[in-house]
């Protein structure tokens, strides 16, 4: 009995010893694990634990404003409400949780705890259709209040779900095998599906959110507005050419004021945005100015909004709150920088109204007929106009018709022909025609190839052996096959050659310069590269691309070698009158005339006024045009407008009446007309997607000149006007340019006292002596 008791005691001691060893082993294991957690991996797990105690909310930033030269707002962010749907609604979790709560409530807590898992799921399945129907009703109400189709709402939610699932898959691929993933933040937050709802809608949606928690949320946002997206401009019709003149004024609605310049923003974040500047960098750090699909955003998609995206874009703020201590850490958002332009919005709107065919000048009119083939009277013509301040290079107006918004009022055939939305002032290129003549002269004198006082005879045709090639416009049967030298009784000075637009003079000048001399001079004038106006952003020339501004067309080295190899002398001489392989934009034309007015000083046109926002490689220096050449060129341009024989002096109507083109009191205009051969006009007439209609033999109409008050000693503004397929430069582009000059007067850029005196002025019929039988200015100035 004693032995049995001793044995039992021994076994008990052994069991206690074993348990002690096991306990000590467990303590040792736990100690090692505790050491690992607190010492070896302590910092990592502390950071992880603290991160779960933190909540982070992003604060929206404000995009910088775009302002005109007077400080008028052209684009700005204003407060707005966005509508967000919780991800639990999007992936179906909300309906399942709603059904589960209903099922538990129907069984009661006690019974719910005793039934099997399968039984619970069965009850939930019975309640799920009711919850889904309830949720569908909520979404129907959201769509109704937001005035969007339910299908659009469903499409937005599907897009969100697809994006979040891609993020989850990416996280799963990066995780350790077998490790259970926690929900990512996108699965626990709301996602914007409708932007910019009114206050009343936001209020109603908040009531809906209170009734159905966890479904819809109204969040603070911003929307981009363009206060000058449209304007109504009142124009004086008493200043129009006689056949269009009528008493009083007309109000022209101008949609899309500056839309091709300012541009637009988009809400969608594209892959290229995230690639260029991700919100979360590869090292896990956050760029508060970066892009993320999960955060509402506004991104420049065209125009200056896109070109100056980084300038205008701000940085979001952040609010972090610790759940354990309620400590709040706040990083304030940084707004984007404002961008000030050189353009005057009121002048711009007025010029765009002048270009609108409703005003009458850019519709084909009976007195404009000329050339080989004409368009029907009343045909709408695309057009562009540019105004540059000579002293600064500031672009005051950069107008084009039709704008994108103008396209809504055009027929399908007109949209095909007129291509609304193209910024013809800066992006479209055209053969310059005769408007280059003063520039070619100045280049020849600057290069030492011509004396400033050179006189050249006009023989009607440049090549003695070919009387039907390289002709002057006056050497035609309708003018009696005469010459300018016959009319002036001798060789022509540059003043006479410019005012009469003699082709032979400038054929001769181009021949003296040679192919490379002419091409190099065109490049000096700004062709072959964009001007760095800011329309393409602050990037240097090698990164600017093609959008926003065209570099123009001029022969490159390979082209010149081909021309030289085949001894093509004809191309050289026609380059002297702006024909052949050369084309430029109205912006480049106005810029070149401003350069001539400054005597060659390079101060290229700019649309952005902030120097820090302009490209770093804008041109400097001077083309060093001799003062005598500049003086003579400007005098020739003055005579072209003021002398009765000048190509920019008058328009002749069908009844024989001739009326001065420019009649602005107190203002001096010096300019050059151009009638440039145009490529065939083609368009889709029946809307089948094929451009089957074509008209050949048409011309583009140019007028480019310099403007000042009569009392000024120097030109103040350079003006360029282009009317596509407008025919005669004097008859079509000239009257448009006259109205642009009137706009400068009305907006106070020319003498204010004369602006007041000119209000309400009308015109009387003006007849001019033909001067000994001298022919009218040409319908066409190009060689054939």
Predicted regions and their residues:
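Membrane-proximal periplasmic segments of bacterial cell-envelope enzymes
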Residues: 1-332, 356-384, 390, 403, ...
């Amino acid at each position: 009995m004693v032995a049995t008791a001793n044995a039992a005691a021994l076994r008990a001691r052994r069991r206690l010893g074993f348990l002690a060893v096991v306990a000590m082993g467990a303590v040792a294991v736990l100690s090692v694990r505790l050491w690992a957690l607190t010492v070896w991996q302590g910092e990592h797990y502390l950071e992880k634990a603290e991160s779960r105690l933190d909540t982070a909310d992003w604060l929206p930033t404000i995009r910088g404003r775009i302002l005109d030269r007077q400080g008028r707002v052209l684009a700005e962010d204003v407060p707005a409400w966005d509508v967000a749907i919780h991800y639990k609604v999007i992936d179906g979790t909300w309906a399942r949780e709603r059904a589960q709560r209903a099922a538990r409530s129907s069984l009661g807590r006690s019974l719910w705890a005793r039934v099997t898992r399968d039984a619970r799921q069965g009850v939930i399945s019975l309640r799920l259709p009711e919850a889904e129907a309830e949720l569908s009703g909520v979404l129907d109400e959201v769509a109704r209040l937001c005035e969007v189709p339910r299908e659009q709402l469903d499409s937005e939610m599907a897009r969100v779900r697809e994006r979040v699932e891609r993020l989850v898959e990416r996280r799963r691929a990066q995780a350790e095998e077998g490790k259970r993933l926690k929900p990512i933040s996108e699965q626990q937050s709301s996602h914007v599906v409708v932007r910019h709802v009114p206050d009343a809608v936001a209020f109603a949606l908040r009531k809906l959110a209170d009734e159905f928690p966890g479904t819809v949320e109204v969040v603070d946002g911003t929307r981009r507005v363009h206060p000058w997206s449209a304007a109504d401009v009142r124009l004086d019709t008493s200043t129009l050419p006689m056949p269009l003149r009528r008493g009083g004024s007309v109000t022209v609605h101008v949609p899309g004021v500056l839309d091709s310049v300012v541009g637009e923003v988009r809400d969608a974040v594209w892959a290229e945005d995230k690639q260029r500047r991700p919100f979360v960098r590869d090292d896990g750090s956050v760029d508060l100015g970066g892009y993320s699909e999960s955060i509402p955003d506004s991104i420049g998609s065209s125009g200056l909004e896109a070109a100056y995206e980084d300038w205008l874009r701000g940085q979001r703020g952040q609010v972090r709150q610790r759940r354990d201590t309620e400590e709040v850490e706040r990083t304030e958002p940084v707004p984007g920088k404002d961008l000030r332009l050189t353009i005057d919005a009121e002048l711009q709107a007025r010029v765009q109204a002048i270009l609108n065919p409703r005003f009458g000048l850019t519709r084909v009119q009976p007195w404009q007929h000329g050339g080989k083939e004409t368009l029907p009277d009343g045909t709408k013509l695309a057009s562009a106009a540019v105004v540059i301040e000579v002293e600064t290079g500031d672009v005051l107006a950069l107008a084009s018709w039709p704008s994108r918004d103008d396209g809504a009022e055009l027929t399908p055939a007109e949209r095909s022909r007129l291509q609304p939305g193209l910024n013809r002032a800066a992006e479209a290129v055209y053969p310059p025609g005769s408007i280059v003549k003063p520039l070619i002269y100045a280049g020849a004198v600057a290069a030492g190839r011509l004396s400033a006082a050179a006189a050249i005879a006009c023989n009607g045709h440049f090549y003695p052996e070919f009387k039907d090639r390289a002709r002057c416009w006056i050497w035609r049967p309708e003018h009696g096959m005469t010459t300018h030298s016959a009319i002036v009784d001798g060789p022509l000075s540059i003043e006479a050659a410019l005012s009469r637009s003699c082709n032979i003079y400038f054929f001769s000048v181009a021949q003296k310069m040679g192919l490379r001399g002419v091409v190099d001079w065109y490049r000096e004038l700004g062709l072959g590269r964009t001007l760095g106006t800011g329309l393409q952003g602050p990037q240097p020339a090698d990164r600017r691309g093609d959008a926003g501004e065209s570099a123009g067309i001029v022969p490159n080295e390979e082209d010149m070698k081909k021309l030289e190899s085949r001894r093509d002398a004809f191309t050289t001489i026609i380059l002297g009158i702006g024909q052949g392989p050369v084309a430029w934009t109205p912006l480049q034309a106005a810029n070149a005339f401003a350069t001539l007015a400054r005597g060659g000083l390079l101060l290229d046109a700019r649309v952005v006024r902030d120097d820090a926002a302009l490209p770093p490689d804008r041109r400097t220096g001077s083309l060093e045009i001799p003062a005598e050449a500049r003086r003579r060129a400007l005098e020739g341009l003055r005579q072209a407008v003021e002398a009765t024989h000048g190509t920019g002096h008058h328009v002749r109507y069908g009844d024989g009446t001739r009326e001065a083109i420019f009649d602005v009191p107190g203002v001096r205009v010096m300019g050059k007309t151009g009638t440039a051969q145009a490529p065939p006009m083609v368009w889709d007439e029946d809307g089948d997607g094929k451009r089957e209609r074509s008209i050949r033999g048409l011309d583009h109409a140019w007028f480019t000149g310099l403007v000042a008050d009569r009392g000024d000693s120097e030109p103040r503004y350079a003006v360029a006007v282009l009317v596509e397929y407008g025919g005669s430069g004097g008859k079509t582009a000239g009257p448009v340019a006259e109205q642009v000059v009137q706009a400068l007067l009305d907006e106070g850029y020319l003498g204010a006292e004369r602006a007041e005196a000119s209000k309400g002025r009308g015109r009387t019929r003006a007849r001019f002596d033909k001067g000994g039988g001298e022919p009218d200015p040409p319908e066409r100035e190009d060689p054939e």
